[in-house]
Amino acid sequence: NIVNEAKTDLDIMWGHHIAFGLPFLENGAQIECNAKKIISEQAMPDSRRFKPGVETDWPSAINLNDQKENASIIPAESEFPYSELSYLSGFGEKGNYSIIDSDRNLGFHLSWDANIFKYLWYWQERYSTQDAPWWGNTYAIALEPWTSRWTPDPKQAINNGEWLSIPKDGTISTKLSASAIIP
């Protein structure tokens, strides 16, 4: 539950930072997801995987060489470093994903209310960012349900109705369901 105890309406971004790393992703992994669309964030470093601002049908994405690439495949740790943030959307009523390491026959599954969490942030930091806060020493993939996409202009996003609005004295109830995938 999220409760607005204020005497005024409140507009928020709300998300859950669910991240994965080593050794789970050492050999790469596969994402299975019911998203329909993917678009990559404009405001990311140059050392990235996908072309920014181009919306495609999930799991296809356009890479920096203007080639189609399967975005559901997470490359092995030994492959090229990059930093990326993409947004998956178009889930219908319920969003869900599984991330699976087929070499270890192990995975993780998550489902959520896609009427509230309309986006899945697909964040990847693979030893690319050489300054704060990662210092070239972070390998993480996060699949994060969020109510909206990131914005440098919160006021504009609120005016456009992009953020979740909680009425004064209001409550929003939801749940996420997580499970391990073990044979």
Give the location of each predicted region:
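Asparagine-centered strand-capping/turn motif at beta-strand->loop junctions
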Residues: 1-6, 134, 180
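Short structured motifs
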Residues: 17, 158-163
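Active-site/ligand-binding surface loops and adjacent short beta/alpha elements
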Residues: 22, 26-114
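Short, structured beta-strand/loop micro-motifs enriched in basic residues and often containing a Trp
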Residues: 150-159
